[in-house]
């Protein structure tokens, strides 16, 4: 069953055949690495951990929050498909929003723990 986004993409880019252009077995796409890169440029102590997280996430095929918790037991699962990751021993926090069907991750927030305490992680 296709949804409105799939139909609009197929209308713009017609294809023939029976394959699904939204392959749920393909690796996740992380949008946007530049946000992480800009952050680790200012906070070089977390560069390696953010690069590792990015590489792991970009190679993953997570289908649900339980799969993320298996790999990241300290991650916090929030409503609306948001996940909070502790970075560098909880000195930094990374919030993502994930669409499991389309295998896409959006970076919603990266900041210090003090900055994280000032935001609403469920709404950012």
Labelled PLM ranges:
Residues 2-91, 99-104, 113-124:
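Basic, Lys/Arg-enriched alpha-helical interface segments
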């Amino acid at each position: 069953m296709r949804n409105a986004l799939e139909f609009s993409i197929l209308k713009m880019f017609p294809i023939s055949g029976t394959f699904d252009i939204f392959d749920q077995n393909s690796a996740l796409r992380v949008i946007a690495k530049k946000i992480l890169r800009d952050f680790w440029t200012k906070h070089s102590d977390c560069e390696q951990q953010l690069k590792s997280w990015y590489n792991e996430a970009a190679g993953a095929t997570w289908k649900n929050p339980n799969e993320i918790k298996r790999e990241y037991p300290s991650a916090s699962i929030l409503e609306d498909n948001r996940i909070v990751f502790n970075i560098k021993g909880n000195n930094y926090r990374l919030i993502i929003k994930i669409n499991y069907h389309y295998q896409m991750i959006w970076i919603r927030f990266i900041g210090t723990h003090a900055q994280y305490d000032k935001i609403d992680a469920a709404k950012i």
